[in-house]
Each structure stands twice: as structure tokens, then as C-alpha cells.
Amino acid sequence: MARRPRHSIYSSDEDDEDFEMCDHDYDGLLPKSGKRHLGKTRWTREEDEKLKKLVEQNGTDDWKVIANYLPNRTDVQCQHRWQKVLNPELIKGPWTKEEDQRVIELVQKYGPKRWSVIAKHLKGRIGKQCRERWHNHLNPEVKKTSWTEEEDRIIYQAHKRLGNRWAEIAKLLPGRTDNAIKNHWNSTMRRKVEQEGYLQESSKASQPAVATSFQKNSHLMGFAQAPPTAQLPATGQPTVNNDYSYYHISEAQNVSSHVPYPVALHVNIVNVPQPAAAAIQRHYNDEDPEKEKRIKELELLLMSTENELKGQQVLPTQNHTCSYPGWHSTTIADHTRPHGDSAPVSCLGEHHSTPSLPADPGSLPEESASPARCMIVHQGTILDNVKNLLEFAETLQFIDSFLNTSSNHENSDLEMPSLTSTPLIGHKLTVTTPFHRDQTVKTQKENTVFRTPAIKRSILESSPRTPTPFKHALAAQEIKYGPLKMLPQTPSHLVEDLQDVIKQESDESGIVAEFQENGPPLLKKIKQEVESPTDKSGNFFCSHHWEGDSLNTQLFTQTSPVADAPNILTSSVLMAPASEDEDNVLKAFTVPKNRSLASPLQPCSSTWEPASCGKMEEQMTSSSQARKYVNAFSARTLVM
């Protein structure tokens, strides 16, 4: 069963048994004929009479049987109609003192919500009656005094704005219930307002000049911690509490004569304490009720901006100028300067502190120290930039859009280098406000040590890359013969000298190199004098090392390790450009030529060759069996 939402702590419109139980109100909607209608329609006189007869005949034990005789009602509806309206045992008269005392005791025991349980202890009363009796009469928080003119004015203004939403109006008047406000309006106030003009002339005449000038000056409230000698104007200065005084700035040109330094300008909607904010909002809404919607929108916008600023990191304390429109000329008042001097501006920011703030924590309220709620600015320049509330709203919208669109790009430029090969460990972007490039130094980044230095791709691609086999071969070569030596460069005939050296080395080692006149050298051909007929698929550079001009040269090493084996690269020439500017300048690295082996290779004996080459009878038999076994399977595609 649907419940009505709670509107007020004094509302009489909520109960877990709440249902439309109007006593014999037969003027409502009639159920449609021809189908079973289960909606909330008023009971007719005929239905009530029929329900009474059915209860007399069948009792109150089985409501489903009774509901079968009422085509448009459910068993729950029949039960509620009987228990709350038609039951002759119900007491509908006034409450006695004993009943009131019993309700008070039960509320203290069960609380002001379990009205069904409370009603079981009161014969003849239902939960709705107990609830209304408590909220309208027995609750000690309910005011029973006569209505004051201030309460009438609040009801009048709220009714103009909200209409007959009594639960909402009751929230503005603590101690008054929605039912009491409704009865007071219908019985007394409506006639006085509509016929006698009650509160209409007095409300316009009683509005102070502060409210009018307040609307002209864009909802700005000034707060100041004045020096002992400074005195605030006595007129138009309502005191909110005993600690801080809030006053209204009437005209921008008279600020310097009234306001001491420094001045904290607060946005009224969020930062002014609740009594002052309610009074200001009430004056603001007197002339234009539509402006309340804009005020609420600005509240949400301010709160969303503040939430986004909550995650901002601590920025370096620097004097810098804000780039936001409307704040570009504001300045911080310095305690060490005269009244006319000013320091550079401070932006809105989380944990952003300046040395010009007072050291005494009691000199400023919590709201003035709260981030994104106030700006500590000089007294003369802020009013020249912030003219009205709509301009301030546009500024906040600009900030909101700037945060959503520009922060990612700014942060990526500042936090991430353009070329990195190592991922950042544990890096987390917590800043949502835009950075200025002059504020964050790259040397101060927390993840600098985890970054690979950015290298230009053109430099990487200009030099030749050594394949992996050459790397292994070079490593073995350095172990045996030591590091490679670079030939000295002659300043005038470098290319000619290198060509002579390379030609001489190529004649000895069998490597032929060709050069281009206007380009980098390219290794064109490696001439192999002796090619092994038995090794076609092995790793040429890593495992087999050979050279020689005759058949007496040993081609394979049998017992010596790789480090002791000869290598083809012992007489090779590596060439690379010396710089990007000189394409024809070469670097040549040479290694002395290998010494020939002491003993030549011996031919294999006739008994050794069949055993070593797999020509024995057992070996050939096993090989043929293996081939038959493999050939028995059909070829298939290897799925990776």
C-alpha cells in the first residue's frame, strides 16, 4: 500500500495505515462499470450498507469472501473501510484527558512513528487519530500561543511563492504544524489579506534600504577583521553573532571609507550564516519569486565547484595573476603595506595559502578560511570586477566548463612527457583544477625518477641498428681480443684514408664494401670464400666460426668454447656516421686478423664415418620406422 512522503516533523499526513477513509463522503468518483476497478475511489452509500450487512453475516475473519461480493473492492480495502470508518466501536468524539495521557506515555515508550502499535492500546482509536492528536496537540514542541505579525508575514510570503504546500511552509515556522498553518490561513489570514490588504503595504514599507541596495550589488556580503582603531559604520549593520559582524556594502565607491583591510568577500548563498541568509533570501524573493530558482541553481553550481576543488593538490606558494574573467584585477591586501598598496592576486584554490593572511586563527571565521568559499582581496578592486550576481554565475560556469575540458589536456602536458618508454608507477592524477605552466616545475614532479629520458626519434633512427646475432658475436669478440678500437680521424683526408684502410682489410678478410658519394655507407656484400656443404640451417654467426683460403683450414671447432673460437667478425669493418651533419664521415672499427690453425683437418676413417653419419644398419632401420610412423598421420594446420 502506497504511503505518502513525510513533509514535516509536524505533518499529519503520514501513517503506515494511511488510506483515504472519508466518513460517508459519497460525492467522489464512481467506479467504472463493466470491469473490476481497484483504484482509490470513494466509497458509495450502497457499498457501505452492503459491507455492513456482509460483516454481520460473515464476520471479520475472512475478508476475501466479503470482497467477492464487492466487485470493485479488494479484501484490504474492505478491511480498512470497516476498521477505520464503519466499525461502530470506533470513537469519533473528543479526546479525554485519560486518552491524552495514555498517548503521551505510549509515544515515550514506542516513539512517534509506530502509531498502529499505539492504537492497539487505545480502544476505539485508530493510528491516524493517535498521530494527529500527538502532532497537533500533545507534542510539547508545538506552539499554542497566538500568531505574531512576523509569523503572518512569513506565511504570506511563502504562500505567494509555494501556494497551498503547507508542509513546505511549516518548515519555515518551527513549532507550527502544517494543519495549524492551513487553518490559520483559511480562517483568518486569507480574508484579511484579500479584503483588508493585510501585510501588503506594510511589507513594502518595512523593507529596509539594505535589501534594495543588496540586490543592486550582486549579493555580496562583506566580512572584515578590523584593526582596533577601525570602526565599521553603525547603520545597516545587522549582527549575526557575537564574534563576527556582517555588514552590507551599499555603494562600490564608498567602500574605502567604510571597510577596513583586508576584506573577505563571501558569496551570500553558501557562506553567510543561516539566519542572515534566510533574511536576505526572503527580501530577495519579495519582488521576484522566479529568482529563487536561480538562487538554488547557483547554490548547486557553487557546491559542485567546491567539491571539484576538494581534490586539488597543494600548489607552490607564488604570487600570480588569475586568468579567470571577472577576477583578473583583484589583489591581496598586505598587512605590511599601507591601505592603498596591494599585492598580486590570489586564486581560488585548495590549501592555497599566502603569507599575507593573519596568523591568528580567531581573526577570521571558518567560512573565510574555507577553500573555494571566499577570496581574500583588496577592498577597492573586487567590486570593480564583480558587478552583479549573474556575472558571477557566468564566471562559475566558465570555471566549470574549463575544469571539464581543459584540465585533462593541461595535466597531460605537465605530468606526462611526450616520449616515455617506462610506465609510471603508482601515478594518480588527483588535481582537477587547471594548472599554470609557470607554477609547476618539472623537477618537482613526484615520479621524475621513474621516467625514461625523452629521446628524439630522429636520433634513434639515424644510426644503424645491430642485429642480435652480431651483438652476441661482438660480445664474444670483446672477451677474446678486448674492446674494439676506433681508428683516429684525420682532419683533411678522412674519407680517402678510411677507404684505403677498408680496402686493405676487405682484401684480407673477404668483405667488400661500397660507398656512396652523398649518402651513408651501406654494407652491400659479404663474400664467403669457403662454404660448408653440411651446415645449411645452423646459426651462422653465433655457433660456427670459420675462415680460410684452402681446404686445409679447420672449418669446425670441436672442443674449444665459443670465447676461444675464431669469428668471421674478427676482420670485419663496422661503419657508422659520426654525426647527423656530416653524412660522409665514417667511423671504422677493426680487429686484427685471426691466426691460422696449427694443424689441418684429417679425413675420416672408413669405420668412423658410418657410425658418425648415421649409416649403421640399426640407425637406418630406426630412421625408416620413424618415417613410416610420421607419414601415417595426415598434415594439418597448426593453430597458434
Swiss-Prot record:
Residues 336-368 are annotated as: Disordered. Residues 35-86, 87-142, 143-193 form the HTH myb-type domain. The keyword Nucleus applies. Residues 376-397 are annotated as: Leucine-zipper. One of its GO terms (biological process) is T-helper 2 cell differentiation. GO terms for cellular component: cytosol; nuclear matrix; nucleoplasm; nucleus; RNA polymerase II transcription regulator complex. Induction: Negatively regulated by microRNA-155 (miR-155). Residues 275-327 are annotated as: Transcription activation domain (PubMed:2189102). SMART domains: SANT. Residues 90-193 are annotated as: Interaction with HIPK2 and NLK. The modification Phosphothreonine is found at T534. GO terms for molecular function: DNA-binding transcription activator activity, RNA polymerase II-specific; DNA-binding transcription factor activity, RNA polymerase II-specific; RNA polymerase II cis-regulatory region sequence-specific DNA binding; WD40-repeat domain binding. The modification N6-acetyllysine is found at K471, K480. InterPro entries: C-myb_C, Homeodomain-like_sf, Myb_dom, MYB_TF, SANT/Myb, Tscrpt_reg_Wos2-domain. It is found in: Nucleus. Residues 328-465 are annotated as: Negative regulatory domain. There is a cross-link at K480 (Glycyl lysine isopeptide (Lys-Gly) (interchain with G-Cter in SUMO2)). Ubiquitinated; mediated by SIAH1 and leading to its subsequent proteasomal degradation. SUMOylated by TRAF7; leading to MYB transcriptional activity inhibition. There is a cross-link at K503, K527 (Glycyl lysine isopeptide (Lys-Gly) (interchain with G-Cter in SUMO1)). Binds MYBBP1A. Interacts with HIPK2, MAF and NLK. Binds to HIPK1. Transcriptional activator; DNA-binding protein that specifically recognize the sequence 5'-YAAC[GT]G-3'. Plays an important role in the control of proliferation and differentiation of hematopoietic progenitor cells. Comprised of 3 domains; an N-terminal DNA-binding domain, a centrally located transcriptional activation domain and a C-terminal domain involved in transcriptional repression. This is Transcriptional activator Myb. It comes from Homo sapiens (Human). The gene is MYB.
